Amino acid sequence: MSIEFTVPLRRRWTRALGIAAMGLAAMVMAGCASHYIDGATKEVNASMFKKPAAPAPVQVLFEFETKGVSNTRATDALKKQVVEQVRASGLFSATDEKPAASGALLGIKLNNVPMSDDAFSKGFATGLTFGLAGSQVSDGYICTVNYVAPGKKPVVKVVRHAIHTTMGAAATPGNSTKAKDINEAVNTMVRQIVGNALNDLSHDPAFN
């Protein structure tokens, strides 16, 4: 899935996400910003997942939050991408937003938070690029995957990621990859953070 951004759409997307850093919102809407995907969270392909011997159907519920508050517009913008990624994972026999015959439920929550928040920084002591300076701001993202199968305890996995944005002559953020635009940055971040969470889930003995 790809979400295309003309300048007006970029403005609407920024408002929809409720970007945690107001400086980032201003940069994006100005149309002259550079966006970088943090390199601490790597790409994980579905081929690396540990596939269950007998995959079961699952209901997928996705929600995007901005600083812990439900963001309906951003949820709607990203839901298809996330559900399709789960469907292509090979971890389940069938994937739907409606209740599954097995009763299994996979909840995926993606929370956009300032990287200075305790909820973000305490869970990521190393890896992400801090020490921001000049016209550079960063948004943190926390992906929480919660898998619940009938008669079993929930299996929860949490992964963190970030998008860095610079404007003008600001130095390139270290350990990051430049995206061509905010569209590519957001879609790549979502794909990577969800992929890592699904990979962690697949290797948990409680899931398999």
Regions found by a protein language model. Give the residues of each.
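A short, hydrophobic beta-strand-centered structural micro-motif
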Residues: 57-62, 98-116, 190
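A short, structured loop/turn motif at beta-sheet edges
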Residues: 52-55, 98-108, 144-156
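A structural "domain/chain start" motif
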Residues: 32-91, 202-208
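Surface-exposed short loop/turn segments
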Residues: 109-154
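Compositionally biased, charge-rich terminal segments
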Residues: 19-22, 106-118, 165-167
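Bacterial N-terminal signal peptides that target proteins for export
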Residues: 2-21
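C-terminal/domain-edge helix-coil "capping" segments
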Residues: 40-44, 138-142, 154-208
